[in-house]
Amino acid sequence: MTEPLRLAVVGHTNVGKTSLLRTLLRDRSFGEVSHRPSTTRHVEGARLSVDGQPLLELYDTPGLEDAIALLDYLERLDRPGERLDGPARLVRFLDSAEARQRFEQEAKVLRQLMASDAGLYVIDAREPVLAKYRDELAVLAMCGRPLLPVLNFVAGHDQRGEPWREALARLGLHALVRFDSVAPPLDGEPRLYDSLALLLERGRPQLQRLVDDQQAQRRLRRQAGERLVAELLLDVAACRRSVATEASALLAATEALRQQVRQREQRCVEALLRLYAFSREDAAASDLPLLDGRWGDDLFNPETLRQLGVRLGSGVAAGAAAGAGVDLLVG
């Protein structure tokens, strides 16, 4: 059986490492996310499997806090006449008292990256390129593991993607991925795994199998969502009530019918939220667009049908895009 790939997610404090892992794992409960720095204090792991076969192990690591001081310390570890390479220097550091005291969090990160097949270096693309980030990359490079930079938070207007691209290239890191964990692109995960496969050729079969399975799951979710909406429309269209002709009875029956439709719609909304791994608190549904209980247009008018057809087509396209985006975000 093929061994699962081990992937460490590393980076500065508060750059979205845990949020990225939640996206890749489709598990909103993984880890702890907060605006406070250094939220993650220990290494946490999770495994992605397909048909019971483990394919990828992902490890969330604490944020790097003082890479500048750590790099200075590492550069003083060589004894007279020694020229240690990166991994040997880190082994000596991890055996030192400083790794258990002053640089305890950094030591956890380096141990995990050295025990992994590769690392994802998560970057908050809204931040300027500072010396501390260059020193972080210099320290991580000593592990001797492939490192793929991931530009996070690239959807906003304040992102600095191009300066980061240039800075990474100057450090010899020419492959990178733009992957916003809040609003991930539709092809974000396949591109991330494809880029990883270029750095880690032996892991290509596992990564491709993950991509194929996720695409199959996305199609199944889409079909299940379409069925839920179709069942809602059929149930509402088939809803009939016989009432007396008195005005009071008609008003009461109309209100009761509206309430039944709202309840049926709400059940559909809740089922869709569960399908895409949202909770009820994540979305607020408005009432159906009715005017005095009736559609404003004659549904059988050819012009109305034409307009509805255009709107429906646009809505389906928008819904498909939104559905895929949600799928990438939370499952």
Describe the residue ranges of each PLM region.
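Conserved G1/Walker A P-loop phosphate-binding module
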Residues: M1-F93
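Conserved C-terminal guanine-recognition region of P-loop GTPase G domains, centered on the G4
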Residues: Q53, L74-L176
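Canonical P-loop GTPase G-domain recognition
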Residues: F153-Q223
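Membrane-inserting effector segments that mediate pore formation, membrane fusion
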Residues: E303-G331
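Conserved nucleotide-binding/hydrolysis micro-motifs of P-loop NTPases
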Residues: T39, G63-E65, R126-P128, V154-D158, ...
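Internal hydrophobic scaffold segments of catalytic domains
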Residues: P37-L74, R191-S195, L200-R202, L251-L273
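Membrane-proximal, non-transmembrane alpha-helical segments
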Residues: A252-R311
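Alpha-helical transmembrane helix bundles of large polytopic membrane transport and channel proteins
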Residues: G203-Q259
